[in-house]
Amino acid sequence: MRILVLNSGSSSIKFQLFEMQTKTSLASGLVEQIGSSSSRAVLKANGEIYEIKRFIKDHHDGLEAMNELFTTSHTLHDLSELDGIGHRIVHGGESFFSSMIVDESVIKKIEEISPLAPLHNPGHLAGIKNAMKESKNVPHVVVFDTVFHQSMPEYAYRYALPYDVCKTHHIRKYGFHGTSHRYVCKQAAKMLGIEFDKFNAISLHLGNGASACAVQNGKSIDTSMGLSPLEGLIMGTRSGDMDPAVVIYLLNIGVLKWNEIDNFLNKKSGLFGICGSSDMREVVAKMQNDERAKLAFEMFCYRVKKYIGSYYAILGRVDALIFTGGIGENAPNTRQKICDDLKHLGIHINHELNFSNERGERCIDEDGAKIKTLIIPTNEELEIAIETARVIKERTL
């Protein structure tokens, strides 16, 4: 069974082809800067790199360029050879509680909730519509970042704002990185020999975007991101949790204008706002001689530690603390700082294992630690492919 995974943005298409029997990637690539004179398409397969440099007008042209690369690399001759195509969708709102086969009603619902994710869902829709034209007889499946968090109880996802306003306008905590949290938790449960529906964990997806998730009996019961990915942990350029009155104050004194709020909170804040760099590698490298870099690092780790304590309290029993994402997988200094002084919770990492150059899934806790501390590289594309295959198989039963 071969599944193609598409992640279509406003000006890009990321793609990966999987053989599901072995769960291996046959090819991966990117169409970027769609609509620009510098647009191009790149594919990696069989240890080779294939590239097309030409003007790519829109998503239709982008998919044609992808098809050309598949043909040139002899990995796929036509999309009709596929068993399914899985599409990543950032926001499913309150309309979707599981991955779905795409039909007109699904497309209409995604269009209706696009105001909740104006930067992402329109690009996803463009990719879906054009891919369906190119492969009419292949089943298409949508996999939502928000679905894993639909198991949160109302007292966890509801904001303490006027109830009727929130209900009418679908204002609530949705959470994101759900595909990543689900994948790494499944892998961790398998690694520890625990049935997933009995597995409790605190999952930390730490990258330029960052979120924490409390998982109880294999289900998300709370997560740090909210209506948008802005809430929660400090991120590369996003503020995370803050007092909303700060924005009101800055508007009142004329420092901010209404049309500058989004850019201020999403692009100019976080690590970048504190020390001028959004890259944790640069922050760590500058810490010794730069007080603001040191402050940014300490603020980031402190915020994560607060969420660990909070989620420990609501879970009661924690089988594993999981690190994933670019920072979670590759920044031992950050992991060490986050886990320092958590021995009273049963979290105790081994210094040598934490700083080891070993890669892949691994335990980094001390022998006898009550809670296993794991590094699990995320693979959202594979999880989307697995979900796509599952939905297609269930439809044929």
Curated annotation (Swiss-Prot):
Its main location: cytoplasm. Keywords: ATP-binding, Cytoplasm, Kinase, Magnesium, Metal-binding, Nucleotide-binding, Transferase. Pfam families: Acetate_kinase. The record marks H177, R238 as: Transition state stabilizer. The active site is at D145. It comes from the Bacteria. GO terms for molecular function: acetate kinase activity; ATP binding; magnesium ion binding. One of its GO terms (biological process) is acetyl-CoA biosynthetic process. Transmembrane segments: none annotated. Substrate binds at R88. ATP binds at K14, H205, L206, G207, N208, G209, D279, M280, R281, G326, I327, G328, E329, N330. The keyword Iron does not apply. Mg(2+). Can also accept Mn(2+). Catalyzes the formation of acetyl phosphate from acetate and ATP. Can also catalyze the reverse reaction. This is Acetate kinase. It comes from Campylobacter concisus (strain 13826).
